[in-house]
């Protein structure tokens, strides 16, 4: 009787898995005995119906002639961190904001906590000191903006004025919440704070700019080089 129940559970679980799209799966998500769930997942990987992302984690996405398409870097980063306030870092941030055409071999993601181990497609960057990103639950676009304001001339391909213009557009269009960005600025590096204050002032948000702690004059002068103050 138990064998029949296990077989029925496996059949039901298989149908559920095959009906899913753009979803991560673990053995614990399957309503079947652990051994049955593990065998089912392994079988579906062999059949090309699932993609093994890492130990104990699988992805059901879109099938292509080359196999199951992998999850996006954003989806994978969110799944592995389970953390608010994550977002693209480095060149990935600049590319996401259309400030660079360069695409790193591994997508870079900043995590405001101890990050998980890297995967084949995603490299995680430790931003545990920048905890306000999580407190204010920044979107990935907002995190990317802070990362660009930090990395700046190391990551942008446009000139500094054009980069600031693009960030102002994102604030004006609602793609970035300026109040959340200002709140999170408290735990950002000094040069990033200087550029953030400049951005907010030149977007007509002087009151928000004053909520961001100022950098020392020398750091501010270096950070704002090439920008009309």
Language model feature labels by segment:
Residues 2-82:
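Short beta-edge/loop segments at beta->alpha junctions of small alpha/beta modules
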Residues 28-29, 106-108, 161-162:
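Short coil/turn segments at secondary-structure boundaries
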Residues 36-39, 88, 140:
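Short, well-structured alpha-helical interface segments that form or flank functional binding sites
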Residues 49, 101, 171-175:
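Short alpha-helix boundary/capping elements
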């Amino acid at each position: 009787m138990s064998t029949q129940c296990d077989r029925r559970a496996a059949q039901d679980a298989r149908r559920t898995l095959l009906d899913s799209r753009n979803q991560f799966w673990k053995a614990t998500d399957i309503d079947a005995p652990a051994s049955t769930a593990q065998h089912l997942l392994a079988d579906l990987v062999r059949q090309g119906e699932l993609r093994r992302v890492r130990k104990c984690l699988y992805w059901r996405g879109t099938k292509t002639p080359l196999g199951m398409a992998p999850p996006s870097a954003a989806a994978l980063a969110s799944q592995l961190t389970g953390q608010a306030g994550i977002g693209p870092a480095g060149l990935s941030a600049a590319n996401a904001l259309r400030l660079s055409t360069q695409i790193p071999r591994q997508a870079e993601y900043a995590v405001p906590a101890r990050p998980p181990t890297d995967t084949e497609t995603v490299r995680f960057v430790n931003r545990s000191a920048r905890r306000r990103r999580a407190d204010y639950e920044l979107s990935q676009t907002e995190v990317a903006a802070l990362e660009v304001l930090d990395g700046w001339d190391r990551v942008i391909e446009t000139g500094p004025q054009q980069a600031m213009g693009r960030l102002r557009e994102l604030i004006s269009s609602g793609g970035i919440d300026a109040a959340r960005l200002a709140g999170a600025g408290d735990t950002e590096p000094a040069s990033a704070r200087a550029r953030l204050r400049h951005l907010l002032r030149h977007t007509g948000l002087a009151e928000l700019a004053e909520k961001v702690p100022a950098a020392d004059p020398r750091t501010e002068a270096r950070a704002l080089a090439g920008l009309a103050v």
